């Protein structure tokens, strides 16, 4: 029987083969859930609704931190350094659209000290800027509450395939205490934030990894509070989604981006 600890190693929400640096076990098709998750219980997003959303070719999501840098999850990449193997797709909700903007990566920066637990953020520099709105990140915990929006091209059900169209859903904040009652010591409360419905049914899933969790700020602008990271299955009752707490790493992200 898989323990929660083992599951955490498997449930990073990315489909990228070889990109989950911490995975010690390889999943065969049809087993548990080790891939970028789509949004379970979501509805289709409108064209232009979330213009900062990015789909990454390794099977993860991301958001435009700047017009030339994508913020995603550390477990979606294999390390830091020059990297021209990733293609970012932006500007569309339909990945098959002829209007899609596709740009190659030039460099990747994985969070310093990332070892598979916490610190799940990374930056990908693109070969050229994408002329689309960016997503501001929270640098204070003031927005780490309320109801959040998640979006992605990941699976629409646990074990399902990736989606052609961008899906969106709303999920409520879950306290650290409540989240720890589900995940125990696997949760890093100082670095992670949880969200989801107690009864399940709405969640990010395989293929959504690295995508943003966001809400409106005091000026009614979108602000990113989380990065899709991991969870037990998708949309299961009493197992909320776990997200990197962006405000905790805002200064480090800003500094790293400036050095790229």
Swiss-Prot record:
Keyword hit for Disulfide bond: yes
E.C. code: 3.4.21.-
PROSITE patterns found in the cross-reference section: TRYPSIN_DOM, TRYPSIN_HIS, TRYPSIN_SER
Cross-referenced SMART domains: Tryp_SPc
Active site: 75 (charge relay system), 120 (charge relay system), 209 (charge relay system)
UniProt keyword annotations, A-Z: Disulfide bond, Hydrolase, Protease, Serine protease, Signal, Zymogen
Prosequence residues removed at maturation: 35-38
Organism superkingdom: Bacteria
Molecular function GO terms recorded: serine-type endopeptidase activity
Peptidase S1 domain residues: 39-258
Disulfide bonds: 60-76, 179-194, 205-234
GO biological process: proteolysis
Signal sequence coordinates: 1-34
PANTHER family: ACROSIN-RELATED, HYALIN
Protein family according to the UniProt entry: Belongs to the peptidase S1 family.
Primary role: Involved in mycelium differentiation.
Protein name from the UniProt record: Trypsin-like protease
């Amino acid at each position: 029987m898989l323990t929660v600890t083992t599951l955490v190693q498997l449930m990073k929400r990315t489909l990228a083969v070889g990109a989950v640096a911490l995975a010690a076990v390889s999943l065969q098709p049809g087993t548990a859930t080790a891939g970028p998750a789509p949004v379970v219980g979501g509805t289709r997003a409108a064209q232009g609704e979330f213009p900062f959303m990015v789909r990454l070719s390794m099977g993860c999501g991301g958001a435009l931190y700047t017009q030339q840098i994508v913020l995603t999850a550390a477990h979606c990449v294999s390390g830091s350094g020059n990297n021209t193997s990733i293609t970012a797709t932006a500007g569309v909700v339909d990945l098959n659209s002829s209007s899609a903007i596709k740009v190659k990566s030039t460099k990747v920066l994985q969070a310093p000290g990332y070892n598979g637990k916490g610190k799940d953020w990374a930056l990908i520099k693109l070969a050229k800027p994408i002329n689309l709105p960016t997503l501001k990140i929270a640098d204070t915990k003031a927005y780490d509450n309320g109801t959040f929006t998640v979006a992605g091209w990941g699976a629409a059900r646990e074990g399902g395939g990736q989606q052609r169209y961008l899906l969106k859903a709303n999920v409520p904040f879950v306290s650290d205490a409540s989240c720890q009652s589900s995940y125990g010591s696997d949760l890093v409360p100082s670095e992670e934030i949880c969200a989801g419905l107690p009864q399940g049914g709405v969640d990010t899933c395989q293929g959504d990894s690295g995508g943003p969790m966001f809400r409106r700020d005091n000026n009614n602008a979108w602000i990113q509070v989380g990065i899709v990271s991991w969870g037990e299955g998708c949309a299961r009752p009493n197992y909320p989604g776990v997200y990197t707490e962006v405000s905790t790493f805002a200064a480090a992200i800003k500094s790293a981006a400036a050095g790229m």
